[in-house]
Amino acid sequence: QYVLFESERDKGTNVTAMYDYLMDSYENFMKVVEAPDNSQYIGGAKNRLRALYPYLLNGAVYYSEQKQPSKALDFAAAYIDMPQLKLFRSELLPKDNRYASVVYYAAVAAFNLEKNEKALRYFQEYLNTGTEAQQKDCYVYMNMIYQKQKKYADQERVLEQAIAKYPVSLDF
């Protein structure tokens, strides 16, 4: 699949097929990484994952522009989650300057698709980036999710954080 992805990428004629091959490659290499007794294949899988990593962001942007939030979320999630894998903890995968925007998009897309645990994880990741632009909205969304889940202790914690950061806001 990876070779097919590279072929389509180099031709540049069928973008949808290219990203389909990219996601297939990602999923297959992740199966290798997660498989038991994978030591003889792990190096190759890691190299391929490292090579396809920047294209995951491009896939997220592409499907976002195509108004396909579920597919965009798949690519964004892969882009966000891959550097957190144990396999890559000893190295820094380069994060694009759009990283925070992609994390926020993924969080909102997950929220809209009612994938609340994923949404919470990505809203928290956005807060961890230190980017100010959408922080207030992250707290609002997290509050709504915890309220919907009836997790009142978590909701109270988020509201306390939000009020400490935005003491004069009427949103909390």
Label for each model-derived stretch:
Residues M23, E27-M30, A77, Q84, ...:
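Alpha-solenoid helical repeat scaffolds
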Residues Q1-D10, S39, G43-K67, L73-M82, ...:
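Amphipathic alpha-helical repeat scaffolds of TPR domains
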Residues Q1-V33:
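Mid-chain, structured segments of secreted extracytoplasmic proteins
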Residues K31-E34, D81, L127-N128, E160-K165:
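Conserved structural position within tetratricopeptide repeats
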Residues M142-F172:
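Extended amphipathic alpha-helical coiled-coil/heptad-repeat regions
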Residues M18, L22-S25, A72, A119, ...:
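Single-residue signature of alpha-solenoid repeat helices
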